[in-house]
Amino acid sequence: GENTMGSNEAGVRTNADLSMLSAFLCRYDRHEPRLALMAEKTLRYAVHTHKAVRRKACKDGRYWGSTSVADHQWESSLWAMSVAYSAFFQWERLDSLMRDDVYRLLKAECDYELERDIPTGYIGDTKAEENGWEVDVLAAALGLFPDDALAPRWFQRMREFAVNSYSHPSDADNHTIPDPWYDNSTISSMYRGANLYPDWTLQNHDFFHTSYQNVVIQELGEAALALRLFQGDRQKWKSETLLHNCDSVTQNVLNWLTLPDGEQAMPNGNDWSLFLYDQVTSYSTMACMRGDADALLFEQQALRKIARRQQTTPDGAWLLRPDVGARRMGVQGHRVMMTWLMHHIFPVGGMQPADVKDFMLRHAEARILPCQNIVRTMTGDYFAC
């Protein structure tokens, strides 16, 4: 790995994803002793090295995570979400002390979410992705501990972060009540500011970035999945805010950049490895939770490409020469795992994928994304932007 057992993203995220994937395979595929031991040891390390638990320091002598506005770490909620999934998959095998430590970790991360401001901004550095992963940890805590005294506050904060993930200027005047079963809060009352341009595009890393344009769908979908999966037969918490504006972003931007093989065009380039197909879980979210036949088509296309690419590596790695080493392996495994779970929990039933020629015909006209100075067109012979 880049920084095995370290306290930064390269160390913590990689370990958390490894733990989650190992535990997932034990629960849904085969319970092999070595795999179960890996799931348990990596979970223990992730939990014990968190700032709220402190039973063991990372190899650099530090602890990871967020506990308050005064002591927080960028992106720690994303890693904590993977820890929560790992804990859920092996919950029956955890002793009471480990369960308590998992609670302390998630409560600390959520304490930070309750204290902090909800950021917004769309020029160069959208906060859409970051707010999306804050939704994830709040949903995970609600799912695992639905009767906690803080659960109503976690729920409200989760909804606010969800509305302000793909937040659009039109939300300021959106008086829809998303959860009338719970209260009369409107979209406009939870809106803090725009993370999208008026044409539904966004910028991250200082340019129009297709990877970040789609990843919020995946994050919000994983939050909805955690709520449904973790709560089991007793669904106390649910919210229509969790896929807020995902349809509009898909229809106004992403569909116009989606290629027949499931890849998405990147008019301004990409600063990660090319041909990752890591938008696969965004497709799964739209197919399984929104009944989107186009998304089902491109999810299947992307999965075929992912499988073919894996066959080119001698050891079964997801891709050759990954940009961020073992961390990329964890992220890619994370995506494929979530895609499987989406279909397991939200099956598409008899829905058939759209026909690719029909999709191309519906998206054949030239399209302008004015806020990014992008023009695209597609014919049966070429795609250009």
Regions found by a protein language model. Give the residues of each.
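Extended polysaccharide-engagement surfaces of secreted carbohydrate-active enzymes
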Residues: 216, 229-235, 239, 259-385
